[in-house]
Swiss-Prot record:
SUPFAM superfamilies in alphabetical order: Nucleotidylyl transferase, PUA domain-like
Domain of life (superkingdom): Bacteria
Disulfide bonds: none
Gene: sat
Protein name: Sulfate adenylyltransferase
GO BP terms in the entry: hydrogen sulfide biosynthetic process; sulfate assimilation
Keyword Nucleotide-binding recorded: yes
Keyword set, alphabetical order: ATP-binding, Nucleotide-binding, Nucleotidyltransferase, Transferase
HAMAP family (UniProt xref): Sulf_adenylyltr
Length: 378
């Protein structure tokens, strides 16, 4: 069983920034990364990566000291801004006119973004949303330890926005020794429910941790998804066995590498196990169906500090009249109703109501209502 690792804590709201003149503007990705670095969500990282750690993560999926880390957490700035900065300086980190933190600059370097795209996303295709975002962001990286000096005020989900130290406390309060984490950016459909409940048979608690940071424009909005999770948990899950809290990070769509990243982060939130399903964190056809599971064979459970639980693609079988997978169902593909978040989105956008084999009625009602609201605001 994994041992609970120590959490980084770089939050200090009493930190005096009044004498610091220089500033770096943060985009939404860097802002959410700043919070997760400070609250320990990205432990053992204490700041944005310097060149040595960046190169090591891109090339080997490890930090320079050998610890497993698969996604480069970087602070991009323009060449103009970079020219005004010096190693050793302390600089304010700002967004929307607010100072949210400071960085002690340890490194300023120009990355090879094509190499980063190829190794992290396995493609340089700009149609890939992660690659597109990588190329759109400024071209110089600033590395160094950070301090979060101001918490976010206009948090859309305050009651569900818990730091890792708080989720750990919640699990402890419930007496959960084993907790399985589930990452999602989609409404939970019946295949997800089947997988989650299968995992719940072997652990004490389920940590449903939907990502609510920046996602693709055609992903269902976070507020609609949160309402869909609430109605699902109220009606179909044992209340004392499930805990819902948001993951405020941006989606990278980095497939296999992001699966490792998501597992490491959930370890920090207090999970002992992590669900990895079909095409985890994938997009389009960039990654193989089970590539995000296969990547875990490169690491031991001990060095990850969390146990991955792999699930095959599940479906509704019309002959079994139940959710199943190829491990539990003998029938052919003609009897299988394949479920996916993409399929649910497609049906809804075409004005069709997903059948009960796809999604719970209460969830569908929330999604239809949310979609109508979206159409009106457009």
């Amino acid at each position: 069983m994994s041992t609970v690792n120590e959490l980084v804590n770089r939050v200090d709201e009493t930190y005096d920034v009044s004498q610091i003149e220089k500033e770096i503007g943060l985009d939404n990705i860097a802002l959410s990364d700043l919070e997760l670095l400070a609250t320990g969500g990205y432990s053992p990282l204490t700041g944005f990566l310097g060149k040595k750690d960046y190169d090591s993560v891109v090339e080997t999926l490890r930090l320079n000291n050998g610890s497993v880390w698969s996604i480069p957490i970087t602070l991009p700035v323009t060449e103009e801004v970079a020219e005004t900065l010096k190693v050793g300086e302390e600089v304010k980190l700002v967004n929307g006119g607010n100072v949210y933190g400071v960085i002690q600059i340890e490194d300023i370097f120009v990355p090879d973004k094509e190499k980063e795209a190829l190794l992290v996303y396995k493609t340089t295709d700009e149609a890939h949303p992660g690659v597109k975002k990588l190329y759109e962001r400024p071209s110089v990286y600033v590395g160094g330890a950070i301090v979060l000096t101001k918490r976010f005020e206009n948090n859309p989900f305050p009651s569900y926005h818990l730091d890792p130290i708080e989720t750990r406390e919640e699990f402890k309060k419930r007496g959960w020794k084993t907790v399985v984490g589930f990452q999602t950016r989609n409404p939970v459909h019946r295949a997800h429910e089947y997988i989650q409940k299968s995992a719940l048979e072997i652990v004490d608690g389920l940590f449903l941790n939907p990502l609510v940071g920046e996602t693709k424009s055609d992903d269902i909005p976070a507020d609609v998804r949160m309402e869909s999770y609430e109605v699902l948990l109220q009606n179909y899950y044992p209340k004392d066995r499930v805990f819902l809290s948001v993951f405020p990070a941006a989606m990278r769509y980095a497939g296999p590498r992001e699966a490792i990243f998501h597992a490491l982060v959930r370890k920090n939130f207090g999970c002992t196990h992590f669900i990895v399903g079909r095409d985890h964190a994938g997009v389009g056809d960039y990654y193989g169906t089970y590539e995000a599971q296969e990547i875990f064979t490169n690491f031991t459970v001990e060095e990850l500090g969390i146990t991955p639980l792999f699930f095959e693609h599940s479906f509704y079988c019309t002959k079994c009249e139940a959710m199943a997978s190829t491990k539990t169902c003998p029938h052919g593909k003609e009897d299988h109703v394949i479920l996916s978040g993409t399929k649910v989105r497609e049906l809804l956008r075409n004005g069709e109501v997903p059948p009960s084999t796809f999604s719970r009625r209460e969830v569908v009602e929330v999604l239809i209502k949310g979609l109508k609201k979206e159409v009106v605001t457009e």
